[in-house]
C-alpha cells in the first residue's frame, strides 16, 4: 500500500522488440497504454523463460471442506501447486485441480494462455488469476468446488466455486 501512496500506480507492459535502429525501437505487439513522458516511462530488459507448456496433468491438494477466507495460511495458500512467473508465449491447457487453495497464478508474464481447466473437490481461495502481466487469456475454466457460503458458513454449497 505504501508504494501506491508515495509513488503512485506502477504500470508494466511487456513487449517484444522487433527491429532496433539507433534510438528507435519497434514493438511486435500494440502498446496497451498511452505513453506520456511526464510519467517517466522507461524500457528495461526482461529476463524470462519462453514457450513453457503445462498440459494433460492433474494436481491434487488437501484443501479442507470448511474453507474460510483469510482464516490462516493453510486456508489461503497451503495448496498452490503451480505458479507461472516471468514467462512469455507460454500456456496451460487440459489441466485438472482437486482441493487446492489456488489453481494457478500468472505473474510478471506476457502472451500466456490458460484454458480447458477443471477445478473440483473442496473450495479454496482462488481459481486462476493474472497479476502484473500483459496479454493473458484465461478461458473455459470449469470450477465445481464445494464449500461453505460466504454469508452463511453453516451452508455447504455444491459447485460453489473458488472464493
Predicted regions and their residues:
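Extracellular/periplasmic carbohydrate-active domains that bind, remodel
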Residues: 1-163
